[in-house]
Amino acid sequence: MMEIDKIKVTIETYNNIVEEYVDYYKSKDLKGNVQFQKEIDYLISQLNKNAMILDAGTAIGDYPKFLTEKCDKNFNVIGIDTSENMLRKAIKNAPKAKFKLMDIRNITFDKDNFDAIICFATLIHVDDKTCLRVLDKFSELLKDKGIIAINVMECNNEEKEIFIPEPFNPKYKTYFNRYSKQFFSDYFTANNYTIEKIYDNKMFDESALGENLVGTNEFTIIARKSKF
């Protein structure tokens, strides 16, 4: 029997749940979220005006919207995603940003192109080996002294990898991978980054997660690329 391509299935899921996704997140004000505000304020404080920022796994473009409309640094933001339906929403949601249909596993931008890369709730949909390849690509894309911000689900005592009915619509299935802080700390230390911040997060609303994800925490790690 042919093995299921869990990542491909997950991409198809996101194409099919865009309305449920929008309905959920439109009630979640990013600016009103204290933890988000702390993280994004730090990121903004570390960037100069006109900085080039990549949002890898942008979904409906909430982060590009915030970065292009809610601060006065005239950032140039590009959001990428594999879901065409999500990107259609993103283009309307954040008209000051640019968007491209692109897989984080096959990014085609030039090297040393970005001052910052943010990747929130996206690496949770790839396995560890793929994640490391993506991080290597991010390293190529970042300028020296560039900032990277990664947000993922944390693995404590839970099952690390799960392939479950999608919490927003159980008609579909989604692959999740949870990570330890050590996984990213080891990578960044070995690849000439300085870890600047690690934030422990709670999910927006555990009641929306389904029984397989209740109790799962998140963390955000922010690191700076050093010169080789």
Located regions from the model:
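Acceptor-substrate binding/catalytic loop of class I
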Residues: P165-F183
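Class I SAM-dependent methyltransferase SAM/SAH-binding core
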Residues: L54-N106
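A conserved beta-strand element that flanks and buttresses the S-adenosyl-L-methionine
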Residues: I118-C119
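Conserved class I S-adenosyl-L-methionine
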Residues: M2-L47
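A short glycine-rich, Lys/Arg-flanked "PGG" loop and its adjoining helix->strand segment in the class I
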Residues: L132-D144
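Conserved S-adenosyl-L-methionine
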Residues: Y193-F204
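Core SAM-dependent methyltransferase catalytic element
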Residues: E206-F228
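Conserved beta-strand signature within the Rossmann-like core of class I S-adenosyl-L-methionine
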Residues: G146-V152
